[in-house]
A protein has these predicted regions:
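Outer-membrane beta-barrel signature, preferentially recognizing the C-terminal barrel domain
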Residues: 272-291, 333-335, 429, 436-492, ...
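Gram-negative outer-membrane beta-barrel transporters
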Residues: 354-355, 391-398, 489-491, 511-590, ...
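Periplasmic-side early beta-strands and strand-to-turn transitions of outer-membrane beta-barrels
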Residues: 164, 171-173, 181, 193-279
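Extracytoplasmic beta-strand/coil segments of soluble accessory domains associated
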Residues: 52, 77-119, 141
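A beta-strand signature from Gram-negative outer-membrane beta-barrel systems
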Residues: 134-177
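N-terminal periplasmic "start-of-domain" segments of outer-membrane beta-barrel proteins
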Residues: 38-71, 100
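Short acidic/polar hinge/loop motifs at secondary-structure boundaries
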Residues: 100-102, 119-147
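Conserved C-terminal beta-signal and adjacent last beta-strands/turns
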Residues: 195-198, 206, 245-246, 432-433, ...
Length: 667
């Protein structure tokens, strides 16, 4: 594994040093997320879509590369944990691991993840297998969090919102950087990127390498003597490249490829000698942008997403000391997701915009471990929206759209949304969005055929939701701060779960079950500049998420609070970022018992940066995550006693106090 680390390190170094050096300073004034209206994006129709949605009444948060670097975040999960209001995201056992997610009271499976507009969600399974455990933070230009029902433009699973991870962008001037560092969990990190003109176009290339021995994932007294894998280690590597050619001011072609691979331990408290997944992932895209006139622009994009993993688990045999039970030996599971997206924007008259689009997705996957048969599914979708601009209605923007989804397996889904934004003047505004969204059944729910467990159902209906998001905001008098009060409401029906039991085969069978998931909540946030040298943000979110009047749904926090401050004196060669993350009551019911609250904790992080030279090409970053070494659980699971076989509660631990240091050379 060390040889892989050094090979990726060499690749990163080549990317960063191989281009001619020139001055390029790293932005430092950014400590967290910001509203998308404040972000200037120079691109074509797809890249500008979040900005257009924000003007129509959709709430969009943005996390920038500067905020990620200043916070010393290692992966995508860490980058979002402390920065985005209303977003709960908890890795199982530290960086590059599975995560539980809740956006404004949602379930994990209600959030759609994309990279450069390509869907990442693992449609083998609905929840718990988020597609984030091999994605490093260093490759990010920005992360866009689009809240509310986003099925109109983004399709399945965007019930509570969509998160688009934008990788390093193009530049007209050659620049880049190389970073190396480590932390007190015996971790090593190296990343680099270079970008600029090349031949007739522009290029971007980036690479990242992370390796760690990790930390103890459970309390020591919750391990069984039979388990000898006591630290959860990982190694994760990424290589990516983009190339763009502008054939004319009206025609642009962009191609990209990213390869992620790694070895990720899977922590288990009993029996395990070693358990891990070997990940491999490729995301290949090609996109053509055409600006035909001032009243018509469009894009066509093809993508191929290949995700494969091999799971290995060797267990100790308590009945034969020194003996090994082979549970899984490089057993494959994975999927291929490929398709075409096309969208056009028309301006038929002043003050009116029309969007028309088509999506095609072909998906197939299989799992040898949990026995999901290999099947293929295709989905065709048509969508359209009409919106106004303030040129037509002063200070008011309205939008309405509809989407029709036709999968080859399962039943069709039609959804629609309406939204509005009114600017009162003086920076005060009112936003509202209402609509519905859907989640298509997963491969497990459609095609599973495990003779000892479960069976899928090809006749499932999609889960469907009704949503309402409303917010009111404005400036704080006398300072450069802005506040926003948000209400969110969501009902989800046609729930997919085990519905019947087949006594002949002994299998649970999936079906659409009665009941409704109801989410009701509110959020208040404030952000901006306290002084020219101090910026910050703070937020509080309350979520009630229940099913049919029952208790709070497991793994969805009742309350969240986040705060951050960034000190960036422009005349001094340093900066400091501090953040607070509070998770309120959050429940789980492991080991066959009743609900257990494993929340109510606060984690503090602090980081500092020192610029060595006047041009700010060289910087040293130090950080302290979990400053007070708070011992907290990110999830609860079930273990089994070696002697009796009885189940017991296991606490998955969050990252302990960790000191990090990095050096960056920019050019």
């Amino acid at each position: 594994m060390k040889s892989i680390l050094f090979a990726s390190a060499a690749a990163a170094a080549t990317l960063s040093v191989g281009a001619p050096a020139m001055a390029a300073s790293q932005p430092t004034v950014d400590s967290g997320s910001s509203q998308v209206e404040e972000l200037v994006v120079t691109g074509k129709l797809e890249e500008e879509l979040p900005t257009k949605l924000a003007k129509q009444g959709v709430r969009v948060d943005v996390v920038t590369a500067a905020a990620i670097k200043n916070g010393q975040y290692v992966d995508i999960i860490q980058s979002l944990q402390s920065t985005v209001p209303g977003f709960y995201i908890a890795p199982k056992n530290g960086p590059f691991d599975y995560a539980r997610i809740s956006l404004q009271g949602s379930r994990t499976q209600d959030v759609l993840w994309l990279e450069d507009g390509v869907r990442l969600n693992n449609r083998l399974y609905g929840g718990g297998t988020t597609p984030l455990d091999t994605l490093p933070a260093s490759m990010v230009e920005r992360i866009e969090i689009v809240e509310g029902p986003q099925a109109l433009f983004y399709g399945t699973q965007s019930i509570a919102g969509a998160v688009n991870i934008i990788t390093r962008d193009f530049s007209d001037h050659t620049n880049g950087e190389l970073t190396a560092g480590g932390d007190t969990n015996s971790s090593y990190h190296l990343d680099g990127y270079a970008r600029g003109p090349l031949g007739p176009g522009r290029f971007v290339a980036y690479a990242s390498a992370d390796e760690s021995k990790g930390f103890m994932p459970f309390p020591e007294n919750e391990f069984q003597p039979s388990s000898t894998q006591r630290d959860r280690a990982y190694s994760a590597f990424s290589l990516g490249a983009k190339y763009r050619v502008d054939f004319s001011p009206q025609v642009r072609l962009t191609v990209s490829e990213q390869h992620n691979f790694g070895k990720l331990d899977y922590a288990v408290p009993e029996f395990v000698k070693t358990a891990f997944n070997n990940r491999n992932e490729d995301i290949l895209t090609g996109k053509l942008d055409i600006t035909a006139s001032d009243t018509l622009q469009l894009f066509v994009k093809g993508y191929y997403h290949w995700w494969r993993s091999h799971y290995t688990e060797f267990d100790n045999d308590p009945s034969a000391p020194g003996g090994i039970d082979v549970v899984d030996d490089h057993d494959p599971w994975g999927y291929v997701d490929r398709g075409v997206n096309a969208m056009a924007e028309l301006k038929p008259m002043r003050g009116v915009d029309v969007y028309l689009g088509y999506d095609f997705q072909n998906y197939y996957g299989s799992d040898a471990v949990l026995v999901i048969d290999k099947h293929s599914e295709s989905v065709n979708a048509l969508f359209g929206e009409i919106s106004t601009t303030p040129e037509l209605l002063h200070n008011l923007t309205l939008a309405a759209g509809v989407r029709y989804n036709a999968p080859s397996v399962g039943q069709n889904a039609t959804v629609g949304t309406v939204s509005a934004r009114y600017d009162f003047g003086g920076g005060f505004f009112l936003k509202a969005m209402a609509g519905n969204a859907f989640r298509l059944p997963t491969a497990e729910e459609l095609f599973a055929n495990d003779p000892f467990d479960e069976r899928g159902n090809p006749d499932l209906k999609p889960e469907t939701s009704k949503n309402l998001n409303v917010s009111l905001g404005g400036p704080v008098p006398g300072v450069g701060l802005h506040w926003e009060a948000i209400g969110f409401f969501r009902d989800i029906k046609n729930l997919i779960d085990y519905d019947t039991f087949d006594p002949v085969t002994g299998q649970d069978v999936f079906g659409n079950v009665a009941g409704t998931v109801r989410v009701r909540g509110g959020q208040f946030s404030v952000e901006g500049a306290l002084t020219p040298e101090v910026s910050g943000s703070a937020s509080y979110t309350y979520s009630s998420a229940t099913q049919d009047g029952g208790p709070q749904i497991t793994n969805i926090p009742v309350s969240l609070a986040k705060a951050s401050l960034d000190y960036h004196p422009m005349e001094l060669p340093f900066g400091v970022t501090a953040s607070l993350n509070y998770v309120g009551s959050i429940y789980s019911s492991p080991a066959g018992g009743g609900p257990i609250n494993f929340g109510d904790y606060v984690v503090f992080n602090i980081s500092a940066r020192l610029f060595i030279d006047q041009e700010r090409h060289q910087r040293v970053d130090i950080g302290l995550n979990n400053v007070f070494d708070k011992r907290y659980a990110t999830a609860l699971s079930t273990g089994f006693d070696d002697n009796t076989g009885d189940p017991y509660v296991v606490h998955n631990l969050g990252q302990p106090r960790t000191f990090t240091v990095r050096f960056t050379y920019g050019f």
